[in-house]
Amino acid sequence: MSDHDTLTMVGLTSTVPIEIVYASGLKPVDLNNLFICADDTERMVGQAESAGFSHNICAWIKGIYSVVVNRDLKRVIAVTGGDCSNTIALAELLERRGVNVIPFEYPRNRSKSDLAAELDRLRNTLSTSWDKIKTETLRLNRIRKKLLELDRLTYEENLITGFENHTFLVSSSDFKSDPDMFLRSWMIFLPRYGTEFRDRIG
């Protein structure tokens, strides 16, 4: 990963509204996906334990830590409320390494106004506007609409395999840091299922 990539990438410890990240000119990257797809997950867990994580903390948190360190990411959005409580310890260790940790909390009370305030705080932190966020939402929703149809064709019509479904849907948490590339990979995938299928979902 180049120096430019590390400066524009924002690691995500869990699902957040990526429209806000893209609207700020940055690229979200789902740290969970990078960890679980790595070839050396056991080594990464051991690396985190050597850095101070105890053995009884979940492997996911330790894997996320090692992904951030190994890829030299400079900025991480840490979901410290509504997700794994160990994310707080993760955030503290990353901050000690000089990583800019941006906390994000889903309100426990499920308050719409509290969630709106948290989203606005994230927007301010990333220095973007609601107009830009709305533009990104429209762009990403066009892709999400295709994924909804893909999901339906998996469980209702058995036209898409579970593996293919899983690959696309899990990757939509960050659209692999490049929605245009994600959409191109989608268009490459479609021809396997013939013209009628492409017309219905493309």
Protein language model annotation of sequence segments:
Residues S2-T8, D120, N124-G202:
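A charged, amphipathic alpha-helical module
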Residues M1-T135:
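Trp/Phe/Arg-rich N-terminal binding region typifying the photolyase-homology
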